[in-house]
Amino acid sequence: MTNTITENIYASIIHQVEKKENSGNEKTKAVLNQAVADLSKAASIVHQVHWYMRGSGFLYLHPKMDELMDALNGHLDEISERLITIGGAPFSTLKEFDENSRLEETVGTWDKSITDHLKRLVQVYDYLSSLYQVGLDVTDEEDDAVSNDIFTAAQTEAQKTIWMLQAELGQAPGL
């Protein structure tokens, strides 16, 4: 683990597991469920950008937000189903997503530029990439190759999305 965000997520997962009886894959269940909450919030944030963006680039970026939402929801479904497969219970209500996600939502406004929206999405995807790194670390520890593969695919897509968003902003990749 190399950055503070990743370390904080890992510490939070460990704290959740210490409260429970350890059955051998509790950390994996905890990080999968954290991903359920965070992916749900991330999809909501992208949806807000989709609705509230205005300006140059709208015609290209509006459908791109649909693609991002579809990808997030695909990861959400796969991660939730994996959690169920290994004996977990995914968060499934807006209240649970809100209480457990580390992503913050704000009320949509028309006064943000497309650049502001894209910078926010870079932050969201950077957080998700860090979360997926925790998932990789935890699933390595608990020897769960299937969940590890899921986190690898999700992190690969998150990092590609960061690169694409940063390129649209005229920035070099900051991974």
UniProtKB/Swiss-Prot annotation:
Induction or repression: Induced by air.
Role of this protein: Protects DNA from oxidative damage by sequestering intracellular Fe(2+) ion and storing it in the form of Fe(3+) oxyhydroxide mineral. It binds and incorporates Fe(2+) ion. Effectively inhibits hydroxyl radical formation by the Fenton reaction and is essential for colony formation in the presence of air. Is also able to bind zinc ion. Does not bind DNA.
Subcellular location: Cytoplasm
Binding-site positions, Fe cation 2: E81
CDD domains found in the cross-reference section: DPS
Pfam families assigned: Ferritin
Enzyme Commission designation: 1.16.-.-
Broad class of the protein's primary localization: cytoplasm
Protein name per UniProt: DNA protection during starvation protein
Molecular function as annotated in GO: ferric iron binding; oxidoreductase activity, acting on metal ions
Keywords: Cytoplasm, Iron, Iron storage, Metal-binding, Oxidoreductase
Family: Belongs to the Dps family.
Record GO cellular component, one term: cytoplasm
List of residues binding Fe cation 1: H50, D77, E81
Subunit record text: Homododecamer. The oligomer forms a hollow sphere and can store up to 480 Fe(3+).
Catalytic activities: 2 Fe(2+) + H2O2 + 2 H(+) = 2 Fe(3+) + 2 H2O
ATP-binding found in the keyword field: no
GO biological process, one term: intracellular iron ion homeostasis
Enzyme class label: oxidoreductase
Domain commentary: 12 di-nuclear ferroxidase centers are located at the interfaces between subunits related by 2-fold symmetry axes.
Top-level lineage group: Bacteria
Keyword Oxidoreductase: yes
